[in-house]
Amino acid sequence: MTATLVAKDLAGGHANRTLFSSLSFTVSPGDVIGVVGANGAGKSTLLRLLAGVDVPLGGTVSSAPDGAFIGWLPQEHERIDGETIEAYLARRTGCAAATEAMESTAEALGSGAPGADDAYAAAFEHWMASGAADLEDRAPATLAELGFTLPTETLMTALSGGQVARVALAALLLSRFDLVLLDEPTNDLDLAGLERLESFVSSLRTGVVLVSHDREFLARCVTRIVELDLAQNQVAVYDGGYDSYLEERAIARRHAREAYDEFADKKADLVSRARTQREWSSQGVRNAMKKNPDNDKLRRKASNESSEKQAQKVRQMESRIKRLDEVAEPRKEWVLQFEIAAAPRSSTVVSTLNEVSITRGEFTFGPVSAQVNAGDRIGITGPNGAGKSTLLKLLLGHLAPDSGSATLGSSVAIGEIDQARSHLDEDTALGDGFELAVPQMNPAEARTLLAKFGLKAHQAASLVRDLSPGERTRAGLALLQARGVNLLVLDEPTNHLDLPAIEQLEEALESYEGALLLVTHDRRLLDNVRLDARWHVEAGKVRLGINS
């Protein structure tokens, strides 16, 4: 079954702050609506309102038919202790809740509770529609299709980030929702996973509302865009795909700026003319008094009439100013203005691997020979679990090979953002840890730099472990700006960054002149960043290639 969702004059936010208001749109079967906006604009808040998890500050959300099976798949940064893959799939597909409801109504039916027969019939119908009846049979094949071979009894806490991403994708593929709400579904997916997700979303007959910072995914999948513009305190709905939205938004912003500039120029001109007329009027009165000391009545009358004409012109100008249609000045958006500080040049050869191999459990990486020279800009791609992070650790000297040799050059100043965002002590307040990491800055300078990256006083006082992944990433970028580096290592840097920050990162990378190792599944980032070579890692082997 499919469903239609209607948001009317919706307002959302927190008790003391409204993030958006007057938002109206309809999600019909087959629609794929992308929600975009800066971090903190209320994207996840909107999904929670559409899911019925939170109560809106204003407006309504309704579905047709009533009781439609709406699936809300939020980001989950923490895993539940003791939860198996099987239990995770049941929970994320809604099958666990449907089973619990059916068992509860069956118990009421058995005890003869009034109305239990109707409640049980509805619960049983929902249980069947959710796919709970055969989920256990369908799950292994779907997991295998995604290259996942571990048994479903495996604990989720035992999985790597890439494995968790594949299980999360499997939950989506196994779901049978009437309408789907997805919050950052592309995070941690490799290229194969992204393509499978795109295929699934594009083939759905149900409506989809999704939040994503993956520009290529948005361009390939969405049919409409809902923009939450925090800077302008506006909401807008754009028909068409993501690239069409970018063009329309650019035109709308240009027109808004032109309209304001025209209004401001016209108002300034009228104000200037009114001021001039007022000065002329005052000067005329003074001149008349000087020329007519004898108070000749006729001359005095003529002077007064002239002054009155000037005053009338002033009033006309002031009236024209009041009649102007006020045009609000477009607010300037917060811009990161991110720069990567440069260190003195390193040795000509930055890092070398010579027939390097390393084995961890059943996984063997290598043998690999590779070299990074000063100023090289290398993009590294490959499936999750292929060995990309292992390659980085060997190049940086974080891992010692079992065989072969790994050499790091002299005067290499490394700036690194790894997938774990582990650049600061987890048990230290962000502000304190940042100050320790950049001793050359005084505390005020360090806090100012954090604020520049959108990390305000309350975040600086929070423990690093309590920060969101996006906040951790911005803290890592702030460190790169504070320290001088000549070897920049970025492992999935766009995960958890919003679109404006991703664009700022691209600009910073364009002006950075040191060596760069960029691991990413972000296809637009790979296309937009200037690279000299691309290395592809798969099954522990590295294929070196020149970027075309």
What role is predicted for each listed range?
Residues 1-258, 341-548:
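ABC ATP-binding cassette signature C-motif
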Residues 108, 115-141, 257-364:
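Flexible nucleotide-interacting loop at or near the entrance of a catalytic core
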